[in-house]
Amino acid sequence: MAENGGRAGKSSGSGTGKGAVSAEQVIAGFNRLRQEQRGLASKAAELEMELNEHSLVIDTLKEVDETRKCYRMVGGVLVERTVKEVLPALENNKEQIQKIIETLTQQLQAKGKELNEFREKHNIRLMGEDEKPAAKENSEGAGAKASSAGVLVS
């Protein structure tokens, strides 16, 4: 995908007008948006797992004596602390992770809207996608959409 994006970027400066966008450029832009969306979803899933781990550790440490020794990884170094020192830091980290997940979820929704708008603007259909919804859209807005050729993305 990165190779296609590189070639599409080079061909855009070679002499085509700004109004005309080739099918390769549309596909490269669409794939770039999909990749960004996947990256956001992946990061959100990773943080969800980390949040679950924090919750598990916090629940476990709440049942333990506050003076008991525990170990915490700080900057790649294992540090010996007490439960009383570690628990507030873990709870703070958990809150921060929750805020980041909320932000990522909002970004993911915005990216999804942007991707759908891009699909509609360039009449992009994915391989394996049903033709029935597309046929219904064409019958309703035949004047605007009949003139533009669709782009098929695998």
UniProtKB/Swiss-Prot annotation:
Gene Ontology BP, a term: protein folding
Compositional bias segments (type: Gly residues): 1-18
UniProt xrefs under InterPro entries: PFD2 (IPR027235), PFD_beta-like (IPR002777), Prefoldin (IPR009053)
Compositionally skewed regions (Low complexity) per UniProt: 140-154
Compartment(s) where it occurs, according to its Swiss-Prot or TrEMBL record: Nucleus; Cytoplasm; Mitochondrion
Main location (coarse class): nucleus
Compositional bias per record (Basic and acidic residues), positions renumbered to this chain: 124-139
CDD domains the record matches: Prefoldin_2
Keyword Cytoplasm: yes
GO cellular component, as recorded: cytoplasm; cytosol; mitochondrion; nucleus; prefoldin complex
MF-aspect GO terms: protein folding chaperone; unfolded protein binding
Keyword tags: Chaperone, Cytoplasm, Mitochondrion, Nucleus
Region (Disordered): 1-20, 124-154
Highest taxon of the lineage: Eukaryota
Bilayer-crossing regions: none
Binding partners and assembly: Heterohexamer of two PFD-alpha type and four PFD-beta type subunits. Component of the PAQosome complex which is responsible for the biogenesis of several protein complexes and which consists of R2TP complex members RUVBL1, RUVBL2, RPAP3 and PIH1D1, URI complex members PFDN2, PFDN6, PDRG1, UXT and URI1 as well as ASDURF, POLR2E and DNAAF10/WDR92. Interacts with URI1; the interaction is phosphorylation-dependent and occurs in a growth-dependent manner.
Similarity field: Belongs to the prefoldin subunit beta family.
Described function: Binds specifically to cytosolic chaperonin (c-CPN) and transfers target proteins to it. Binds to nascent polypeptide chain and promotes folding in an environment in which there are many competing pathways for nonnative proteins.
Name assigned to this protein: Prefoldin subunit 2
Species in which this protein is naturally found: Bos taurus
Taxonomic lineage: Eukaryota, Metazoa, Chordata, Craniata, Vertebrata
